[in-house]
Amino acid sequence: MQGMNGDGNEGLIVSVVVCTFNRSTLLDVCLESLAGQRTDGRLWEVVVVDNGSTDDTGGVAGRYAERQGNFRVAVEREIGLSRARNRGYRESAGGYVAYIDDDARARPDWVSVMIDFIRRNPGVAAFGGPDYGYALCHRPEWLPPEYMWTELDTAKGRERPIRFPGERYTGCNMVFRKDVLESFGGFDADLGMSGTGIGYGEETNLLLSMQRAGHTVWYLHDLKVDHLIQERKMSLRWNLRSFYENGRTYDRTVGRKYGLFMRILRLFGAAAAGMIQFVNPRAMPFKRRLYYSLRYPVSEIGACVTYVESLRNKGRFHTG
């Protein structure tokens, strides 16, 4: 394995992969945050994966590659975030592969925090950290204060093992040991975002598989990124679509063990909890009340629809 090897020698430790599709302006902000890292450039690199963009993504990435000696560009023409992420780790030269979204900004010590952790835990298979939402436009008052923040309880420790999916970090701030990532075949190309389409679950599916195989997943509270809340994600309509797709993803990853009866129970339970949430006397904007009351029922509907589709595909479900 390149990077940190068994005898403790150091080469290129981390390859930071940035997958991007038609977001050249946001990519510029992300890459600038990486260019400003306070870490020896001989220990890490940046691999920008252009996933078939038609805007100025190639130009932006190319300018950073010319300016920064440890930046380079790869291309994945088959659309899909999982495919781009897989291209990224295959192109990487480091012993560890870190992923950050193209609409996220790394804190100045982001790379140094992960390298320090790897040095202290040379066999660690996977870890990630919190992300904090920020907006460039007016943030609607109805959005929950915790919206697009992913931060785990530090009372249990700032560095600690976690169990997916009960505790989790998001795909915009995660690190894998490359040989472990390769041994699982990378990310499932049938899961995740595809172009402008909403999709989730590729990192959850992978991390669950790693856990089942005996690998430990860690949370590092000091490994921080800021994640842009895009304007389109500040509408209730977009969030309802997101809840639905999350449910579909849940069924294809975590929820595979449930039969039809248990799924119906979960749906009714979510609906009942949603009604209780809606009539909660606590004062809040109407749209926020809808957000809280609909997120789990809509997600369970997505899971049930996906389950029925799978039965139809197997010829085990008939409507007539």
Task: State what each model feature region is.
Residues 23-37:
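Short, well-formed alpha-helical segments that are part of the catalytic scaffolds
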Residues 33, 50-59, 104:
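A conserved acidic beta->alpha catalytic loop
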Residues 76-92:
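Glycine-rich, basic loop-to-helix element that forms the pyrophosphate-binding segment
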Residues 97:
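Short aromatic/hydrophobic "clamp" motif used to bind/position activated sugar donors
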Residues 129-130, 146-167:
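Short, flexible, basic/aromatic active-site loop/helix in glycosyltransferases
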Residues 169, 193-208:
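Acidic donor-binding loop at a coil-to-helix junction in glycosyltransferase catalytic cores
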Residues 241-248, 255-320:
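Non-catalytic, C-terminal membrane-associated alpha-helical segments of glycosyltransferases
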